[in-house]
Amino acid sequence: MNTQETDFGDEIIQDDLPVHTIPPRYIFLPWHRVKKEFIRRTQWNDLTARMIKRYWLQQLKQPEEEWSLDESIDAAVSVVVSADIALDRTLKCLVIPGEDLLDIRALWRDVNELNCHIRYLGFNESFGSSQKGTRVHVANNAVLSLPRVYPDSCVVPDRFESIQSRDSQAFSYLKQYGPYHVVNLDLCGSMFPNTVKDTSEYYTALNQLLIYQFANQRCEWLLFITTMVEPTVIDADRMHALCKPTRENVKENGDFAKKLKTFLPNEAFRNVEASINLKNFSKDQLIQLFGVALGKWLLALCQAAQPQWTIAMRKSFKYSINEEKGAVMLSLAFALNPNITPPVDETGMAKLELAAKKYPTESECALKLAESVFQIRDVDETLAADAELKSKLRDSHADLLEAAGYDRAAYIKWVEEGEKTTND
């Protein structure tokens, strides 16, 4: 073969081969801090693994998998995605990933032993996985090469908020890849009512998401919402609007009102018909109020749906992102369950023995929500009190970042020197 032919052939091969690696990175950003690994491992992935084991395992069970032929005793196990993998038996995830897809990499790491296939749709405002030359493209290629990752998983260059329009490209993708077992909304912005930026797009998009999920999902699913909360810029009027379901519960549910008084100022809801009295709220109490209000807003939507849905807050956390401004990230987790009841024959004509299925009432859900908000844990305090845990998380995060093209030793040094960024 002549040189011209060789070059021509090389070009074809290079175009077809996915790019997996780029030069190592040495600059680390706020979301590379150990506390983010805590959230991934302790909240997102632990809760997902629990749901797989308890509820989803059978529905995610695939036909017998094909194993690669080059395995040896010492070789890493690899799985070839078979052509007969059932699409409706994949763990379907909706995410808002960064350019390195660290959340998806971590999810795969922590649930791969459960032998389920992951299929994901990601929204990234800057770049999509089909755009060659971007880190998102490289990262997506690397993730797709992992065992049990469905090959059409992708990241599209769009905002999650765009799904609020049913005519948008984003909503079209939402339908194509759903319904979802896991929705992880790791937001760059804030759902906390504030005077800096309007939050209505987030609420509209989340409402649209729930409409879609309620119409198409028939099993329990997880919703993670990570949002910035900055009490110093609270929009009192918008907070009052968000708290409408909360105020109604205070008026109608004595147990709920009593529970709120254990961690919020007593005079806050003294006149539920008027605006909430925010005068004596501390910053921590405003964060708790927002947690309750957002949870009650979601619960109201669940109760308005037909059939209704039960929602429960799972273990949730907060951590500081700007001590001077009192800003924190609130990482909330919710499990949503459809209230589907089988038809029971009360005449005795049918011989099936079916007990009427009972679900928690709205009042019971509201009370448990208030209790869960009160139990939100501070990640900074947890890590400060447990050096061994922080060390383990640092090392596991270093492994994750190294797989994504970062220099491991540089990351360890960065953590040991206080995790400072250019904005500090």
Protein language model features and the residues they cover:
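Conserved beta-strand signature within the Rossmann-like core of class I S-adenosyl-L-methionine
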Residues: A215-P231
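Local beta-strand N-terminus motif with an aromatic residue
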Residues: T90, P179-Y180, E220
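SAM cofactor-binding core of SAM-dependent methyltransferases
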Residues: G9-F171, G348, T361-A387
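Short, flexible/disordered intra-domain loops and linkers
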Residues: Q131-V136, D167-Q169, F192-Y203, A236-A241
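C-terminal target-recognition/interaction regions appended to catalytic cores
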Residues: T3, F8, I340-D424
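A short acidic, Gly/Pro-enriched loop at the edge of an enzyme's catalytic core
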Residues: S168-V182
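A conserved mid-domain beta-alpha-beta active-site/ligand-binding segment of alpha/beta enzyme cores
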Residues: C243-N339
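A short, conserved alpha-helix within the catalytic core of class I
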Residues: Q164-R166, G189-Q213, R218-C219
